[in-house]
C-alpha cells in the first residue's frame, strides 16, 4: 500500500527491479577485494531509500576487503535487502530468498522484511545465516565476520535509530550521473494503512551541513542529477531544528555544482510559501513535485488518518501552478480502501480529471497486519477495487498523453543515460521524468550532425510524444538561437 511517505508509483507501473552493479562501481569494488574474504553478492528489492542502504553495505564490505560480485552465481554469500511494504513486495522478497536457498547460498536477510519478522525468518529459512534490521546495516561487516565464524546472527534493533551520514562508505548502483541522497530516515506520521513507521522508526534528520557535504562528494564524482529522498521530505529538519527546514536545505544545495536537484516525497501541508519560493528561486532545483495524495474525498482521508489533508488538495495545487507555472506534478492514489463507496471513488475520478496531473500511480488497497486499516470493516471486493483502478488509470492515460504532447516542439535539456549499441539510439530523461518511475526521452542525432553520449546533458528538440515517453533530436547552437528568435 503506497503511503504518502512510501514508494512512488508510475503511470506505467512496475515494482522496483533487482539491480546489478553497474560496471564502474563493480570495477571500483573489485579493486579493493582480497582473497582472504568470501565473495558477496547483493539482491536488492524495494524503494530507492532501501537502495541507499544497500549502497552503504556495499561500500562497507568493499572497504573491509570483501569481493563484491554482480553475479550471484560467483558469490558464497548473498545479502538480500528486502521490502515488506505491501503483500506483493513481501511475496517477491520471500521468492528471492527461497530461490537463493535452493541454490545452496548462504543468505543474509537485511531490510524491511528482517525488521518486520525478525527471529521468525531465521526459524523459517535454515539457509539464512543472519538477519539485519533497517537500523543496523552499518554493522554488516561485523555480521558477516560472525557468519564466517559459524554463527547465526540476529542484528535487529527493536527501535531503529541509526541514520547514515557522508562519512559512511558508499558505492552507488545507479548510473554515474544520477544519485539518491537520503536527507532523513523514519516517519512521525501514522497513516492508518502504512507500516513504514514500525519498520523504519520515527523521523531523524541529518544536519544541513552533512547533506551538503555528501552532495559535494557526489558532484566530484560527476553526478548531474541529485534526488533528495526520505519518508516525508517536506518535514525535513522538524525533529532536528524544531521546524521544517526544506527551504533552507534547498538554498544550501543550490551552491553545489550539480545541474539538477529533484525532490521526492513531498507532503501537501509541507509545501509552504517558503518552500515554493525556494523551488522558484534556486536555479538547479527542478519544478518537479512528487505529492502522494492517496485520495481526494474527505471521509476517505479521515479513515486514512490524513484529516489534515482535507481542503488542502485543490487549494495547494492551484497555488503550486500559480507560483510554478511549469511545474510537473506526480501523485499516487489508493482505491478500494475499506468503506470506499462508488460516490467517493467518483469524487476521486473527477478530481484526477480536473487536476490533470502529469504522472499518476494507482494502487489497490492491501491490508497490512499491525495497521489500523487492517481491522476496518466494509472491505471493498478485490474485483471492484481492480475495476476502479482500471478506470482511474484509463482516465489518466489520456491526460498523460495530452501533458506529454504539450512538450512537442520545445527544446529541453536531456540527461543521456543509455545507448543502444546496435541502433545507436540514445535514451535519457528531461526534467519531467524521474528515474525508474516515469517515462524517458528517446534521442536521435540532429539533422546538422549534433550528437551526444551517455552521461552527458544535451539540448533536445522534442518531436513526438505518447502516453509515457517523448522522442526528440539533439540540436546545435544555431538551432537554439533560431528557436529563441522565433519564440
From Swiss-Prot:
<keyword id="KW-0479">Metal-binding</keyword>
<feature type="binding site">
    <location>
        <position position="112"/>
    </location>
    <ligand>
        <name>[4Fe-4S] cluster 1</name>
    </ligand>
</feature>
<dbReference type="GO" id="GO:0005829">
    <property type="term" value="C:cytosol"/>
</dbReference>
<dbReference type="InterPro" id="IPR007197">
    <property type="entry name" value="rSAM"/>
</dbReference>
<dbReference type="GO" id="GO:0046872">
    <property type="term" value="F:metal ion binding"/>
</dbReference>
<dbReference type="Pfam" id="PF00919">
    <property type="entry name" value="UPF0004"/>
</dbReference>
<dbReference type="GO" id="GO:0006400">
    <property type="term" value="P:tRNA modification"/>
</dbReference>
<dbReference type="Pfam" id="PF18693">
    <property type="entry name" value="TRAM_2"/>
</dbReference>
<dbReference type="InterPro" id="IPR005840">
    <property type="entry name" value="Ribosomal_uS12_MeSTrfase_RimO"/>
</dbReference>
<dbReference type="InterPro" id="IPR002792">
    <property type="entry name" value="TRAM_dom"/>
</dbReference>
<dbReference type="InterPro" id="IPR012340">
    <property type="entry name" value="NA-bd_OB-fold"/>
</dbReference>
<comment type="function">
    <text>Catalyzes the methylthiolation of an aspartic acid residue of ribosomal protein uS12.</text>
</comment>
<feature type="domain" description="MTTase N-terminal">
    <location>
        <begin position="38"/>
        <end position="149"/>
    </location>
</feature>
<keyword id="KW-0408">Iron</keyword>
<dbReference type="InterPro" id="IPR006638">
    <property type="entry name" value="Elp3/MiaA/NifB-like_rSAM"/>
</dbReference>
<dbReference type="InterPro" id="IPR038135">
    <property type="entry name" value="Methylthiotransferase_N_sf"/>
</dbReference>
<feature type="domain" description="Radical SAM core">
    <location>
        <begin position="173"/>
        <end position="402"/>
    </location>
</feature>
<keyword id="KW-0949">S-adenosyl-L-methionine</keyword>
<feature type="binding site">
    <location>
        <position position="47"/>
    </location>
    <ligand>
        <name>[4Fe-4S] cluster 1</name>
    </ligand>
</feature>
<dbReference type="InterPro" id="IPR020612">
    <property type="entry name" value="Methylthiotransferase_CS"/>
</dbReference>
<dbReference type="GO" id="GO:0103039">
    <property type="term" value="F:protein methylthiotransferase activity"/>
</dbReference>
<dbReference type="InterPro" id="IPR013848">
    <property type="entry name" value="Methylthiotransferase_N"/>
</dbReference>
<keyword id="KW-0808">Transferase</keyword>
<feature type="binding site">
    <location>
        <position position="187"/>
    </location>
    <ligand>
        <name>[4Fe-4S] cluster 2</name>
    </ligand>
</feature>
<feature type="binding site">
    <location>
        <position position="194"/>
    </location>
    <ligand>
        <name>[4Fe-4S] cluster 2</name>
    </ligand>
</feature>
<dbReference type="GO" id="GO:0035599">
    <property type="term" value="F:aspartic acid methylthiotransferase activity"/>
</dbReference>
<feature type="binding site">
    <location>
        <position position="83"/>
    </location>
    <ligand>
        <name>[4Fe-4S] cluster 1</name>
    </ligand>
</feature>
<keyword id="KW-0004">4Fe-4S</keyword>
<keyword id="KW-0411">Iron-sulfur</keyword>
<dbReference type="GO" id="GO:0051539">
    <property type="term" value="F:4 iron, 4 sulfur cluster binding"/>
</dbReference>
<keyword id="KW-0963">Cytoplasm</keyword>
<dbReference type="Pfam" id="PF04055">
    <property type="entry name" value="Radical_SAM"/>
</dbReference>
<protein>
    <recommendedName>
        <fullName>Ribosomal protein uS12 methylthiotransferase RimO</fullName>
        <ecNumber>2.8.4.4</ecNumber>
    </recommendedName>
</protein>
<feature type="binding site">
    <location>
        <position position="191"/>
    </location>
    <ligand>
        <name>[4Fe-4S] cluster 2</name>
    </ligand>
</feature>
<feature type="domain" description="TRAM">
    <location>
        <begin position="405"/>
        <end position="476"/>
    </location>
</feature>
<dbReference type="InterPro" id="IPR023404">
    <property type="entry name" value="rSAM_horseshoe"/>
</dbReference>
<dbReference type="InterPro" id="IPR005839">
    <property type="entry name" value="Methylthiotransferase"/>
</dbReference>
<comment type="similarity">
    <text>Belongs to the methylthiotransferase family. RimO subfamily.</text>
</comment>
Amino acid at each position: 500500500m503506497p503511503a504518502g511517505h512510501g514508494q512512488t508509483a508510475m503511470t506505467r507501473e512496475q515494482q522496483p527491479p533487482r539491480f546489478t552493479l553497474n560496471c564502474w562501481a563493480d570495477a571500483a569494488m573489485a579493486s579493493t577485494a582480497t582473497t582472504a574474504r568470501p565473495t558477496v553478492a547483493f539482491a536488492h528489492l524495494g524503494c530507492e531509500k532501501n537502495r541507499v542502504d544497500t549502497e552503504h553495505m556495499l561500500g562497507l564490505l568493499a572497504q573491509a576487503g570483501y569481493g563484491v560480485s554482480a553475479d550471484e552465481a560467483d558469490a558464497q554469500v548473498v545479502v538480500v535487502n528486502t521490502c515488506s511494504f505491501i503483500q506483493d513486495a513481501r511475496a517477491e522478497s520471500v521468492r528471492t530468498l527461497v530461490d537463493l536457498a535452493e541454490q545452496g547460498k548462504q543468505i543474509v536477510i537485511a531490510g524491511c522484511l528482517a525488521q518486520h519478522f525478525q527471529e521468525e525468518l531465521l526459524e523459517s529459512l535454515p539457509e539464512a545465516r543472519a538477519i539485519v534490521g533497517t537500523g543496523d546495516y552499518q554493522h554488516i561487516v561485523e555480521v558477516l565476520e560472525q557468519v564466517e565464524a559459524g554463527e547465526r546472527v540476529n542484528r535487529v534493533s527493536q527501535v531503529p535509530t541509526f541514520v547514515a551520514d557522508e562519512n559512511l562508505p558508499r558505492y552507488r548502483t545507479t548510473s554515474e550521473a544520477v544519485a539518491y541522497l537520503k536527507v532523513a530516515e523514519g516517519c512521525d506520521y501514522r497513516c492508518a494503512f502504512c507500516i513504514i513507521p514500525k519498520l523504519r522508526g520515527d523521523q531523524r534528520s541529518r544536519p544541513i551541513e552533512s547533506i551538503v557535504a555528501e552532495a559535494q562528494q557526489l558532484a566530484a564524482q560527476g553526478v548531474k542529477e541529485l534526488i533528495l529522498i526520505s519518508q516525508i521530505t517536506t518535514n525535513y529538519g522538524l525533529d532536528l531544528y524544531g521546524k521544517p527546514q526544506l527551504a533552507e536545505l534547498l538554498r544550501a544545495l543550490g551552491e553545489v555544482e550539480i545541474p539538477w536537484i529533484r525532490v521526492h516525497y513531498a507532503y501537501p501541508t509541507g509545501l509552504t510559501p517558503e518552500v515554493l519560493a525556494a523551488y522558484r528561486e534556486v536555479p538547479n532545483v527542478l519544478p518537479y513535485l512528487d505529492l502522494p495524495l492517496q485520495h481526494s474525498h474527505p471521509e476517505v482521508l479521515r479513515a486514512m488518518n490524513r484529516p489534515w489533508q482535507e481542503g488542502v488538495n485543490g487549494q495547494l495545487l492551484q497555488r503550486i501552478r500559480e507560483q510554478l507555472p511549469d511545474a510537473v506534478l506526480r501523485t499516487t492514489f489508493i482505491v478500494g480502501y475499506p468503506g470506499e463507496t462508488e460516490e467517493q471513488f467518483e469524487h476521486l475520478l473527477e478530481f484526477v480529471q480536473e487536476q490533470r496531473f502529469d504522472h499518476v500511480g494507482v494502487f489497490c488497497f492491501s491490508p497490512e497486519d499491525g495497521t489500523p486499516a487492517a481491522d476496518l470493516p466494509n472491505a471493498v471486493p478485490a474485483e471492484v477495487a481492480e475495476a476502479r483502478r482500471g478506470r482511474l488509470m484509463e482516465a489518466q492515460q489520456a491526460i498523460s498523453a495530452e501533458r506529454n504532447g504539450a512538450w512537442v516542439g520545445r527544446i529541453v535539456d536531456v540527461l543521456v543515460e543509455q545507448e543502444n549499441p546496435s541502433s545507436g539510439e540514445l535514451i535519457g530523461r528531461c526534467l519531467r521524468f524521474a528515474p525508474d518511475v516515469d517515462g524517458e526521452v528517446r534521442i536521435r542525432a540532429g539533422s546538422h550532425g549534433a550528437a551526444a553520449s551517455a552521461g552527458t546533458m544535451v539540448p533536445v528538440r522534442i518531436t513526438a510524444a505518447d502516453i509515457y515517453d517523448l522522442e526528440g533530436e539533439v540540436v546545435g547552437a544555431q538551432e537554439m538561437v533560431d528557436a529563441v528568435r522565433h519564440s
